[in-house]
Amino acid sequence: IHKSIVTTDEVRASGLLKDRIIITYPEEGTVNNDMAILQAAADDWKEKWEHWTQYCFEQHYAYVNPILIIQVLNGTGDALTDTNLDDCIIKIEERTGFKLESGQVVHTFGGTMATLTVNGLDVRYEEPSSIAEDRNIRVVFFKENLSTGWDCPRAETMMSFKHANDATYIAQLLGR
């Protein structure tokens, strides 16, 4: 066993630590606050996408393919989720200019491992531990299972439709 000293800059350069965490929420009274936050998240994700594309090209590195992670609401009644996933896909495509394709959007909803149809797009279930290795994945919808014990260095932007007050839960979610 050898002791290794690794600086924060080296870890950050590897992509395991993010340069910054930005927490944003619109002012009260803003129409559809959640979709405004999703718009901002999609804009941020696109900027990171462009940055990584340029950086990997310049450094002759394998392409990173950053992921947008979206925490959705639990469902009520028979609904799988109370978040309108169709609207989410539409908003992401509008803001980024990307036309998402089958295999690029996945879900980790433990209640169903079925493939969902969202805005005409097949959204398959993906085991959380497999997400980091699948370079085709761009967007992940989740409920709770990614909030603890999951790590994906490609996860560049996260947005949550859930309202949380518990400091421990918030810290765990941000730690992902």
Protein language model annotation of sequence segments:
Residues 1-61, 65-67:
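Conserved P-loop NTPase catalytic core
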Residues 7, 11, 36-44, 84-91, ...:
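Alpha-helical scaffold elements adjacent to nucleotide-binding pockets in ATP/GTP-utilizing enzyme cores
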Residues 9-13, 97, 150-151, 162:
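Short, surface-exposed basic-aromatic patches at helix termini and helix-loop junctions that form
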Residues 14, 18, 75, 174:
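Single, functionally critical "micro-switch" positions that shape active/binding sites
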Residues 17, 134, 151:
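A short catalytic or substrate-binding loop motif that flags glycine-/basic-rich loops and adjacent residues
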Residues 29-32, 78-81, 150, 169:
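Extracytoplasmic/secreted cell-surface and envelope-processing proteins
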